[in-house]
């Protein structure tokens, strides 16, 4: 049985993930992968296309990482003042949520940050720190000052 190399265009159970080069029997390749548009023959042109796509993706990832590092510098250089209602002993009525912090960042700095990337657990008045995941390996720690209204 002849074996040929195929580049997968989508995830195929038992074979591999999208973009991988797999070696399969020619019958399986022609009757299932190629016919069902789940793969293409691994010709030099197709391999070059994949290589170019990977380079573009790596460049895009690096640009996003650099933007995240710049954003981290900006965020860490600022202190957010968040006015909230609080009881007599400095306890908040509830907690400050990531949504509130995201809206305060947008209001003060004009930056849109997804609330899901913000890790906040603030329940008292005074200074505190909030962690924001900007990229896979870039985290910003911003200073927050919670003040009573």
Swiss-Prot record:
<dbReference type="GO" id="GO:0019843">
    <property type="term" value="F:rRNA binding"/>
</dbReference>
<keyword id="KW-0699">rRNA-binding</keyword>
<dbReference type="GO" id="GO:0003735">
    <property type="term" value="F:structural constituent of ribosome"/>
</dbReference>
<dbReference type="InterPro" id="IPR020069">
    <property type="entry name" value="Ribosomal_bL9_C"/>
</dbReference>
<dbReference type="InterPro" id="IPR000244">
    <property type="entry name" value="Ribosomal_bL9"/>
</dbReference>
<dbReference type="InterPro" id="IPR020594">
    <property type="entry name" value="Ribosomal_bL9_bac/chp"/>
</dbReference>
<keyword id="KW-0694">RNA-binding</keyword>
<dbReference type="InterPro" id="IPR036935">
    <property type="entry name" value="Ribosomal_bL9_N_sf"/>
</dbReference>
<comment type="function">
    <text>Binds to the 23S rRNA.</text>
</comment>
<dbReference type="InterPro" id="IPR036791">
    <property type="entry name" value="Ribosomal_bL9_C_sf"/>
</dbReference>
<dbReference type="InterPro" id="IPR020070">
    <property type="entry name" value="Ribosomal_bL9_N"/>
</dbReference>
<protein>
    <recommendedName>
        <fullName>Large ribosomal subunit protein bL9</fullName>
    </recommendedName>
</protein>
<keyword id="KW-0689">Ribosomal protein</keyword>
<dbReference type="Pfam" id="PF01281">
    <property type="entry name" value="Ribosomal_L9_N"/>
</dbReference>
<dbReference type="GO" id="GO:0022625">
    <property type="term" value="C:cytosolic large ribosomal subunit"/>
</dbReference>
<dbReference type="InterPro" id="IPR009027">
    <property type="entry name" value="Ribosomal_bL9/RNase_H1_N"/>
</dbReference>
<keyword id="KW-0687">Ribonucleoprotein</keyword>
<dbReference type="Pfam" id="PF03948">
    <property type="entry name" value="Ribosomal_L9_C"/>
</dbReference>
<comment type="similarity">
    <text>Belongs to the bacterial ribosomal protein bL9 family.</text>
</comment>
<dbReference type="GO" id="GO:0006412">
    <property type="term" value="P:translation"/>
</dbReference>
């Amino acid at each position: 049985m002849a074996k040929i190399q195929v580049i997968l265009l989508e995830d195929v159970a038992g074979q591999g993930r999208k973009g991988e080069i797999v070696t399969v029997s020619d019958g399986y390749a022609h009757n299932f992968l190629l016919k069902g548009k789940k793969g293409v023959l691994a010709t030099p042109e197709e391999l070059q296309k994949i290589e170019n796509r990977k380079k573009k993706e790596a460049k895009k990832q690096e640009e996003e990482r650099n933007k995240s590092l710049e954003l981290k510098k900006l965020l860490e250089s600022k202190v957010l003042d968040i006015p909230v209602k609080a009881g007599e002993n400095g306890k908040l009525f509830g907690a400050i949520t990531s949504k509130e912090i995201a809206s305060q960042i947008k209001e003060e700095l004009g930056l849109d940050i997804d609330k899901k990337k913000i890790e906040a657990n603030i329940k008292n008045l005074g200074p505190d720190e909030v962690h924001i995941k900007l990229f896979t390996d870039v985290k910003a720690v911003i200073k927050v000052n919670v003040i009573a209204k």
